[in-house]
Structure formats: C-alpha cells, structure tokens
C-alpha cells in the first residue's frame, strides 16, 4: 500500500495536491498543499503513536537504525520525519523515544521537473556537472529524479547513490520510481560508500545523489569527477552566496549551480561555478 493510501486509511480523506503532512501530539493535523495549508482534527498522543506504528508496518524495531537519524523512508520514497526525545550515549544517538510529532513528505514523480535547467547541463555536446540548490521542500529531489530519468533516456549510463531511499525508492533492489532505462541504483548506505562502489561496479557516465553535506561525500564525488564521471547532486542553501560559504560541499566538482525558486519546479538562477 502506498503512503498516501495508508495516510488516508489512518486519517480519512486527504486534500488534493498534498505535499506534506505534519502530525503533532495534541495539535490539529496540518496539511501543506500546492495551493496552501489545511488543518484537520486534533491528534491525541495515543493516536500519534498508532499512526507511527502503522506507517512502520508495526515493526519500529526494524526501523531503529533510521529512527536514530530522525526519519525513515517508505517503500514509495515518501519520508517520515520523527521528532521527540532523542536518547544519546555521549554524542551518539541510540534511540528515539517519547514521540512528539511526525512530518510526512510526499514523494512526487513530475515529468518535466528538470525542464528549467536541463538544457544548461550541456555545453555543446558535453554534459556538465551541476548542483541543485534550494531550501527544504522546493523540489530538489523531484528535479534530480527527473533529470536522472531524462539523461538515462537520452543514452547516458546513470548511477544513483540513494542513501535515503528517496530518489528511486527501490524495493528488493528494483526502483519503484521511474529513473530511466539505463540507470543503476545503490541504496540504503552512506553516499560516500555508494559512490565508491558504483565507480567500481557499474561504469557510470553520470552519478546522481541527493543532499550532499559533509566532506566525505564531497571527496567521494571529487574522486568520481577525476575518473571523468559527471555529477548531479543537491544541497540545502537559501542562496548561491550561502552555498559559496560552504566550499566543502562541492570542492570544485561542479560546473554550475541551479538555484530553485520559491515554488516547487521553478528555477530562479543558474550560475557557473
């Protein structure tokens, strides 16, 4: 059962154009839609726990490793963020306890989501590496997925390092989302490990990955670039100036940055790096 079907069974009829569901203990359900916000009924603490259990297939233990990071990903690519009391051993998270809220981000396949920048990926016949940049919830993952599909359809061997299971939503190793006919996916492991394995195993022409952030990710992508592989990736930033202050994110791997606009699917700026 897909995530929206599960939520509808748990919460009743959902509004159309749904992008995100936020459920907070003792507060009204909040629905963020393409045309604005809606609010639903109050979610008591015991019901919030029941909804979390149902989304996790009544096996929170199996999701323990993900929950320590504050989220888990559904089989169709939707991500369930979990907030509450995080139990730590020093600086190492060991468990998520006393759940206070859930944030379900709806995974969407939108053909054409990359149209605003796809042409800029090419300089003549040469493909360039690009970093897709925006704040949260403005379509970076959707645009990356669509670009991977289109490059794959256009003849490139594409590899996806899908740490959070959101780009391809693999089930038993097979993508549930359309990422193209020439695409291979390594999912469920840290990006820097996946990139290294893909270089060895799949002879990629293009590597696609989501939300790079630390130096290990950037160094793995730098090694891929040295091998002649083009990179498409995303990073959180509110502006290209903010991005420039975080050189560790891209380490000269990328030829251009694409800043998405204030609405999903809109491109605000494309700049050479």
How would you name each of these model-derived features?
Residues 1-76:
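N-terminal accessory targeting/assembly segments
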Residues 60-127:
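P-loop NTP-binding catalytic core
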Residues 130-132:
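Hydrophobic anchor at the beta1->P-loop junction of P-loop NTPases
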Residues 140:
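Conserved lysine of the Walker
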Residues 151-198:
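P-loop NTPase switch/communication element
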Residues 202-263:
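Conserved P-loop NTPase nucleotide-binding/switch module
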């Amino acid at each position: 059962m897909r995530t929206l079907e599960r939520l509808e069974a748990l919460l009743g009829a959902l509004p159309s154009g749904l992008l995100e569901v936020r459920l907070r203990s003792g507060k009204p359900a909040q629905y963020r839609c393409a045309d604005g916000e809606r609010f639903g009924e109050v979610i008591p603490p015991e019901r919030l726990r029941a909804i979390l259990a149902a989304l996790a297939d009544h096996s929170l233990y199996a999701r323990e490793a993900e929950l320590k990071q504050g989220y888990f990903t559904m089989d169709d690519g939707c991500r369930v963020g979990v907030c509450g009391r995080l139990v730590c051993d020093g600086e190492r998270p060991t468990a998520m306890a006393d759940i206070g809220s859930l944030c379900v981000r709806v995974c969407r396949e939108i053909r054409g989501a990359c149209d605003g920048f796809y042409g800029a990926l090419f300089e003549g016949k040469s493909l360039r590496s690009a970093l897709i940049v925006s704040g949260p919830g403005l379509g970076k993952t959707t645009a990356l997925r669509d670009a991977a599909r289109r490059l794959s359809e256009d003849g490139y061997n594409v590899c996806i390092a899908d740490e959070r299971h959101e780009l391809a939503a693999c089930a038993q190793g097979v993508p549930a989302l359309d990422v193209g006919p020439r695409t291979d996916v390594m999912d469920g492991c840290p990006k820097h490990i996946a990139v290294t394995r893909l270089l060895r195993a799949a002879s990629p022409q293009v590597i696609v990955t989501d939300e790079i952030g630390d130096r290990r990710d950037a160094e793995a992508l730098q090694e891929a670039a040295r091998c002649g592989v083009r990179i498409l990736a995303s990073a959180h930033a509110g502006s290209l100036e903010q991005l420039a202050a975080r050189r560790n994110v891209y380490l000269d791997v990328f030829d251009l940055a694409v800043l998405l606009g204030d609405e999903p699917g809109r491109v605000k700026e494309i700049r050479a790096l």
